[in-house]
Amino acid sequence: MTYQNQDCRITEKFQSVDDFLDIGKQKELLNLFLHPKFPWALTLNAVNGVDTNLQIQDDSTIGMFHTFLYDGQICSPFFENIKFMLDDFEKINLLRNNLIRLRAGLFFKNPDSRPHVPHVDAKIPHTTAVYYVNDCDGDLVIYDETYKSHPWKAPEFPTENYRFAPCQNKLAIFDGQHYHSSSYPTQKPLRLAITFNFQQ
């Protein structure tokens, strides 16, 4: 896949786009997600977004999430408030018709700086794009290991390939078959990101 945006810095497995949205669109997203009536859901397992155990464990990855689209189907009335971003993705050759999952995630400040459990967002070949809504810390870690090489679970000690330090209005793009981890912000009060998964 070729990305043609002039602000896109390309490495072998990882790409980042600075200043992805204009200021007006940035403010629109912040106003949406920080509005007191926006429906965030609590999860005790922020990696998957679903926790059937409902027991708080010492290693629980607690956060908030909102799913806009899943398995290619719109599942939130707020999708209309965010779909304008798809025009910007098409400018870098990520096509809206290939979007299979769209989810916002929110982590609050936590002293634990360790990366969360390595995971992939989908089992099929896909490209993952993570957009940072606010200025925050809490690195995104991408590993060498892929779902193809470890189809059921990431190795216990995966090999770190790239570490992306988040910043407001930046976009991280990578092959979604690579295991990756989010992490809590330890300095800023919250980390707000939107994850897009595009089928390859």
Spans of model-derived segments:
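Non-heme Fe(II)/2-oxoglutarate
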Residues: 2-96
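Catalytic core of non-heme Fe(II) oxygenases with the double-stranded beta-helix
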Residues: 75-200
